[in-house]
Amino acid sequence: MVSIPEYYEGKNVLLTGATGFMGKVLLEKLLRSCPKVKAVYVLVRPKAGQTPEARIEEITSCKLFDRLREEQPDFKEKIIVITSELTQPELDLSNPVKEKLIECINIIFHCAATVRFNETLRDAVQLNVLSTKQLLSLAQQMTNLEVFMHVSTAYAYCNRKHIEEVVYPPPVDPKKLMDSLEWMDDSLVNDITPKLIGDRPNTYTYTKALAEYVVQQEGARLNTAIIRPSIVGASWKEPFPGWIDNFNGPSGLFIAAGKGILRTMRASNGAVADLVPVDVVVNMTLAAAWYSGVNRPRNIMVYNCTTGGTNPFHWSEVEYHVISTFKRNPLEQAFRRPNVNLTSNHLLYHYWIAVSHKAPAFLYDIYLRITGRSPRMMKTITRLHKAMVFLEYFTSNSWIWNTENMTMLMNQLSPEDKKTFNFDVRQLHWAEYMENYCMGTKKYVLNEEMSGLPAARKHLNKLRNIRYGFNTILVILIWRIFIARSQMARNIWYFVVSLCYKFLSYFRASSTMRY
């Protein structure tokens, strides 16, 4: 059987979502580890006044591509940028470009999607379902297409506790839903959204499930496969440890915790935090396309790309490693010392929100007003709470994913391919990974230099001293207000102090007797 790099040799690849987190990493890995790939066509839309070419130039000039740039200085020559809008008819492609793609493309990686949990149903359907349908329509016309790879999510069927590697029947016919959305106004769509998504937490998971069904039905005559990653996090090893470039998902929460802004969060300490490094997902995606291209399985292949079943990690452990990392290597200009309390209790959660989030933010904004600056902390806290609401469903529950196809795929790889395209999460050491992840948010998201660590540590010590001073003043005030004015309170106080003294005396005496 040919190796993975040999399979991609001379192939023309079509990639959507190249400007997204996973798409960037896939583009870099494909060009670096399969250097004889013929060309990678990337479908990109203009955005914020930038042309597609300018967007790709900016991406390929970032640190993520440093290793590739060193190994293959001319790699950009293989990237062919195509202006496209996936939600428009015919993908908004000109006829000559469309004919070129139909003639030459061998492999499609469909990574494009909206990952916003608060997307309206109309937009989520357009970006996740309609775009997939239209890309499949183009794929069906391609004369040399070997594989269509669709990137989904492990939470597409989060309304089930046990999720197999199959495409489940959809809650509604995607075609009928798309037809209905054409004549509904936004108000009506928003009104029916809760009933449509049912027991799913958001439109993202709902539309990703619909997109899988579209792939199964529309791609019935194609050689298709689906990858379902769970919570995609920073890179494990490639192109270097800790690469992350966005605030999405847990990354934003890690930063908020490191800054001392996030103090409490609704989560189950025992729930599995099914994080999966982005390079694991990319390696598995490239390997899955190789397997389908070489073996041409009779049925659609579905791969649950998760870690919880083979190398479980829990939210309590996430909290511990994030806080310990940021205490050793603090972020610059932290608001408070890092400390997070996870709770699944509704009343405790709202108590800590009021005491640890809103009260300090309110007082800090008063301080900013007094000093003539614009208040900002309450706005930050409000945004943080919105993000927490969207994530608490995933931090409070656990799922069981079947990963037999993932194991099968791993066993099909040659020893060399297992090294180059490693997705064996049993080898993942969580403590090391979490430290690299946190440091990645510091270096690549916040763009903080490691040379600033001494000043950041000094600032954290200053915050500690302020806290100790504040607590001391608080104790003195409580003493003056409550204890010093009440005979009963003084008697209770003296009793507690006497009891503690007797206990310590007994403990010292017992220790002396042992020796």
UniProtKB/Swiss-Prot annotation:
UniProt EC number: 1.2.1.84
Q: Which InterPro entries match?
A: FAR, FAR_C, Far_NAD-bd, NAD(P)-bd_dom_sf
Q: Does the keyword Lipid biosynthesis apply?
A: yes
UniProt keyword annotations, A-Z: Lipid biosynthesis, Lipid metabolism, Membrane, NADP, Oxidoreductase, Peroxisome, Transmembrane, Transmembrane helix
* Chain ranges on the Cytoplasmic side, renumbered to this chain: 1-465
Q: What membrane topology term does the record carry?
A: Single-pass membrane protein
Main localization of the protein described in the UniProt heading: membrane
The family database entries (SUPFAM superfamilies) matched by this protein are listed as: NAD(P)-binding Rossmann-fold domains
Task: List the subcellular locations.
Answer: Peroxisome membrane
Q: Which residues lie on this side of the membrane: Peroxisomal?
A: 484-515
Query: Which GO cellular component terms are attached?
Result: peroxisomal membrane; peroxisome
Q: Name one GO biological process term.
A: ether lipid biosynthetic process
One annotated GO molecular function is:
alcohol-forming long-chain fatty acyl-CoA reductase activity
For the keyword NAD, the answer is: no
Function description: Catalyzes the reduction of saturated and unsaturated C16 or C18 fatty acyl-CoA to fatty alcohols. It plays an essential role in the production of ether lipids/plasmalogens which synthesis requires fatty alcohols. In parallel, it is also required for wax monoesters production since fatty alcohols also constitute a substrate for their synthesis.
Its recorded name reads: Fatty acyl-CoA reductase 1
